C-alpha cells in the first residue's frame, strides 16, 4: 500500500475556495442589514433613527429637540418638524408615535424616559446627554450618560417595545404626556396597576391648521416588572389675581403617590420606581390606537403578548428584509447598497397603518368608528408623493398601493372629497393642487384596478368641476374661466400647473371610460399653463386679474422658501419645466430643442436647481427629450446622486417629504424614472448597479421579475438599450413593456 501523498497545490487551492466561501457566507448581508436609519437625521431631512415596522402605526424615536442645550435646533426656537436631530446632545425621552420626513411639527408624543435616584419630573432637569447610539432596521440603542442606563428599542406594527438596563439602586421610568413635538395640548393618564398605565394624548393642528380638529392618540403601557412605587404628576397653570393669594399650591407641580385615579391636564405624567439590588432590565410595551384605550390594549395583547423583546425584534427585522428584498442589487459598493436600501426603507414608512388589529379606525372628522378588512392607510402627503412614491409602490408593492387607493376612496365617502394631505383621519388641505386624481390615474394606468374605479372617476370629476366651496381646488372658477389663477390667489402659477397635471390625468381616465367629451375638455384644460408663458423670458410668470403680466417680476424670487407672488415653495426657474404631460408642447413654446435644452441647462449652471424641492426633481431627466443630449441626463443624475445622497446623517438633500426624495434616489440608482405622473412610462438613464432585479407580484403582473442590467462599467454614455435582446429606439419605455419584459439591458460605450 502506497503512503498517501498530500498534493500541496490542490490542498492550498481547496483551502482558498473554502475560505472564500466561508467568508462570503459569514459576511453575506441581507438587504435589511444595509439600512442606516441615521441617514436623513440631519440637514432637515426630518427622519428619525428609532425602530418602526413597515407601514407601522407605532414608532420610537429618541427625543432630543427640547431645551436650550439643543439650540439652535430646538423645537420651539425655529420651524422644526422632527423629534430628533443628529447634532443635538440633550435627550429628554423616547417618543412612541412619530412622523418621518414631514415639513410641519406633529406627533412626537408619549415620552418614556429612564432615570435613577430621586424622581425628577422637570424634563430640563432629568434630561441627559447620551452616547454609543446604534441604529438599524427594527432596532435602536443608546447609553443615557447621566444615569448609566442602556436603552434598547424595537417595534411591531402597533406596539413599541423598550428595554432598559438599570444599575443597582433606585431606578425610575417616567411617562411624560406634557412634552411633545405637537403644538396641541391635553392628556389623560391612569395607573391601572403596578405593571400597567393607560391614557390618551391630544395631538393635531398639523402645519398650524384647524386646531379644532385635534384628536386623541390612546395608549396602554405594560411593564415586565411590578413597580415598588408609582405615582402621577400634574403641573397646573399659574393663577394671577386675588385667588392666587389664597392658593399656596399656585402653579406648583403636584405629585400624587400610589394613586390609581384618572388625572387629566396639559402637563401630566406618571412614574414607576424600582429598588434594584443588582443590575436589572425592565421591558415596557406600549400599544397604540387612534380608536380607544381598549383597542390599544388589544393591539398589545394580540400583536405582542408575552413575547420577548428579542423575539419581536427578529420578527420585525424579517418583515423589513422581506419588503426590501423585493429589489435586489448587485455590483455596487457598500455605501451604494446602504443609501439605496435606506431610501427604499424610507419609502415604506408612510403612508402607514391607521386601523387597529380588529380593523377599526376613526373616519374623517371622527364622527364614528368604522371597520375594514383591508388596511386603512394614513399620512398622505400627496403633493410630494404623487411624483414618484406611488408609481414606485405600483411597481414593487402593488397590493399596498391598491389598499392606499381604497383608503383614499373611503376618505371620499367620509369627507366628500378625495384627500390632499391627510393625517390620521384629519384632512389638513396643506399645499396646492388636486394630487389624489393623479395618483389614482397613475395606479389605474399601471394595471392596478381592484377597487371601485367608477367611484374613483366620479370623485375626480367632482373635485375638478365643483366651483363652489371646493377645498381641493381654490380659485377653480377663475381657472375654468380664464385658464389660470390670477394674483388674487396664492401661488397662482404653480397652482395652475398642478391643476393642469390633474386635468391631464382625468383626461386619461376619461379615455379609459370612453368619455370622449371629457377627454377633449380636460386635455384642453391641461394645456392652459401656456397662457402664463412669457416668450420674452422663456419663463412662466403670473398674471393680474385684468390679464396683464404681474410687475415687478423677479424670476429668482421664491428660492429657499422665500415668499413670492407667483409660486408655492419655489421660483419661476424651479417651476418652469413642471409640465410633465406636455414637454413636447413646452419645447415648441421655447423655440425648439436647442432653446429648450439651453434653458434647462441654465437652471443647473445658475444654481437655480433645488434637489430638495419637488417641482424640479424631474428636471435632470428632461434632457432625454432632446435627441443627442441624453448623455446630459446620465451625467446630471449621477452627479446629483453622488453630491446629495450619502451614507451619513446629512445624506439627504433636505426634507424627505415622506419618502419622495428617497424614491427619487431608488429610481435613479435603478436607471429608470416615472417622468410623467399619470402616464405609465419610464425614462431611462444609466443604472448605478451592474444588475437590479425587481420581483413582481404575481397577483398583478404576469412575470416573476424584471432585470435591469448595465453591460459595461466604465461610466461612459449609453450606446444602446435593449429589452429582451431587441434594441429600443428611444430612452423611454412603457410600464407594460417593462413589466412584461425579462431583461432591460443598458449598454454603455
Task: Name what the model sees in each region.
Residues 710-725:
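Surface-exposed interfaces of beta-sheet-rich extracellular modules
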Residues 2-16:
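Bacterial N-terminal signal peptides that target proteins for export
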Residues 699-705, 745-749:
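Terminal leader/tail segments of proteins
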Residues 29-390, 394-438, 444-497, 510-531, ...:
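Accessory carbohydrate-recognition regions in carbohydrate-active enzymes
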Amino acid at each position: 500500500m502506497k503512503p498517501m501523498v498530500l498534493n500541496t497545490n490542490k490542498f492550498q487551492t481547496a483551502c482558498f475556495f473554502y475560505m472564500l466561501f466561508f467568508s462570503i457566507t459569514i459576511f453575506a448581508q441581507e438587504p435589511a442589514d444595509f439600512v442606516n436609519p441615521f441617514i436623513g437625521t440631519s440637514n432637515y431631512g426630518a427622519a428619525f433613527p428609532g425602530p418602526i415596522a413597515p407601514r407601522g402605526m407605532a414608532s420610537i424615536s429618541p427625543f432630543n429637540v427640547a431645551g436650550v442645550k439643543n439650540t439652535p435646533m430646538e423645537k420651539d426656537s425655529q420651524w422644526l418638524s422632527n423629534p430628533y436631530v443628529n447634532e443635538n446632545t440633550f435627550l429628554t425621552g423616547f417618543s412612541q408615535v412619530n412622523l418621518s420626513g414631514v415639513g410641519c411639527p406633529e406627533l412626537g408624543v408619549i415620552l418614556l424616559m429612564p432615570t435613577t435616584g430621586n424622581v425628577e419630573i422637570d424634563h430640563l432637569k432629568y434630561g441627559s446627554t447620551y452616547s454609543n447610539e446604534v441604529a438599524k432596521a427594527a432596532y435602536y440603542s443608546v447609553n443615557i450618560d447621566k444615569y448609566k442606563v442602556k436603552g434598547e428599542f424595537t417595534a411591531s406594527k402597533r406596539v413599541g417595545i423598550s428595554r432598559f438596563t438599570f444599575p443597582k439602586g433606585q431606578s425610575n421610568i417616567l411617562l411624560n404626556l406634557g412634552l411633545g413635538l405637537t403644538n396641541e395640548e391635553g392628556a389623560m393618564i391612569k395607573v391601572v396597576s403596578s405593571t400597567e398605565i393607560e391614557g390618551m394624548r391630544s395631538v393635531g393642528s398639523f402645519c398650524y391648521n384647524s386646531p379644532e380638529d385635534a384628536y386623541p392618540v390612546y395608549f396602554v403601557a405594560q411593564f415586565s416588572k411590578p413597580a415598588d412605587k408609582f405615582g402621577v404628576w400634574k403641573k397646573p397653570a399659574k393663577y394671577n389675581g386675588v385667588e392666587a393669594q389664597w392658593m399656596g399650591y399656585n402653579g406648583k407641580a403636584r405629585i400624587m403617590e400610589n394613586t390609581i385615579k384618572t388625572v387629566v391636564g396639559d402637563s401630566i405624567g406618571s412614574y414607576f420606581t424600582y429598588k434594584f439590588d443588582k443590575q436589572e432590565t425592565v421591558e415596557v410595551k406600549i400599544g397604540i390606537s387612534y380608536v380607544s384605550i381598549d383597542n390599544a390594549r388589544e393591539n398589545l395583547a394580540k400583536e405582542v403578548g408575552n413575547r420577548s423583546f428579542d423575539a419581536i425584534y427578529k420578527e420585525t427585522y424579517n418583515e423589513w428584509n422581506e419588503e426590501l428584498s423585493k429589489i435586489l442589487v448587485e455590483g455596487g459598493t457598500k455605501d451604494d447598497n446602504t443609501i439605496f436600501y435606506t431610501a427604499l426603507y424610507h419609502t415604506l414608512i408612510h403612508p402607514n397603518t391607521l386601523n387597529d388589529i380588529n380593523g377599526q379606525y376613526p373616519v374623517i372628522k371622527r364622527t364614528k368608528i368604522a371597520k375594514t378588512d383591508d388596511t386603512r392607510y394614513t399620512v398622505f402627503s400627496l403633493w410630494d408623493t404623487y411624483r414618484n412614491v406611488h408609481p414606485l409602490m405600483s411597481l414593487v408593492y402593488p397590493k399596498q398601493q391598491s389598499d392606499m387607493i381604497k383608503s383614499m376612496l373611503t376618505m371620499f365617502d367620509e369627507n366628500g372629497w378625495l384627500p390632499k394631505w391627510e393625517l390620521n383621519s384629519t384632512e389638513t388641505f396643506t399645499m396646492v393642487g388636486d394630487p389624489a386624481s393623479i395618483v389614482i390615474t397613475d395606479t389605474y394606468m399601471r394595471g392596478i384596478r381592484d377597487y371601485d374605479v367608477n367611484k374613483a372617476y366620479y370623485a375626480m370629476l367632482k373635485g375638478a368641476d365643483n366651483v363652489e366651496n371646493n377645498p381641493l381646488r381654490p380659485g377653480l372658477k377663475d381657472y375654468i374661466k380664464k385658464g389660470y389663477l390670477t394674483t388674487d390667489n396664492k401661488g397662482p402659477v404653480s397652482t395652475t400647473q398642478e391643476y393642469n397635471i390633474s386635468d391631464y390625468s382625468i383626461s386619461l381616465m376619461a379615455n379609459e371610460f370612453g368619455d370622449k367629451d371629457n377627454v377633449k375638455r380636460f386635455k384642453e384644460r391641461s394645456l392652459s399653463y401656456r397662457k402664463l408663458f412669457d416668450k420674452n423670458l422663456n419663463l412662466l410668470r403670473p398674471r393680474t386679474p385684468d390679464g396683464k403680466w404681474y410687475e415687478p417680476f423677479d424670476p429668482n424670487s421664491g428660492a429657499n422658501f422665500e415668499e413670492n407672488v407667483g409660486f408655492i415653495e419655489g421660483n419661476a426657474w424651479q417651476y418652469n419645466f413642471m409640465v410633465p404631460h406636455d414637454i413636447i408642447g413646452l419645447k415648441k413654446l421655447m423655440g425648439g430643442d436647442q432653446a429648450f435644452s439651453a434653458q434647462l441647462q441654465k437652471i443647473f449652471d445658475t444654481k437655480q436647481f433645488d434637489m430638495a424641492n419637488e417641482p424640479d426633481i424631474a428636471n435632470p431627466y428632461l434632457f432625454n427629450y432632446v435627441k443627442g443630449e441624453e448623455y446630459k441626463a446620465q451625467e446630471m443624475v449621477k452627479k446629483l446622486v453622488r453630491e446629495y445622497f450619502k451614507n451619513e446623517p446629512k445624506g439627504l438633500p433636505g426634507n424627505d417629504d415622506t419618502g419622495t426624495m428617497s424614491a427619487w434616489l431608488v429610481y435613479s440608482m435603478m436607471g429608470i424614472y416615472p417622468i410623467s405622473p399619470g402616464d405609465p412610462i419610464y425614462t431611462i438613464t444609466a443604472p448605478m448597479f451592474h444588475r437590479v432585479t425587481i420581483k413582481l407580484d404575481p397577483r398583478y403582473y404576469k412575470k416573476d421579475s424584471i432585470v435591469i442590467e448595465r453591460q459595461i462599467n466604465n461610466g461612459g454614455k449609453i450606446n444602446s438599450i435593449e429589452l429582451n435582446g431587441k434594441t429600443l429606439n428611444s430612452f423611454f419605455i412603457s410600464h407594460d413593456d417593462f413589466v412584461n419584459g425579462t431583461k432591460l439591458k443598458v449598454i454603455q460605450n
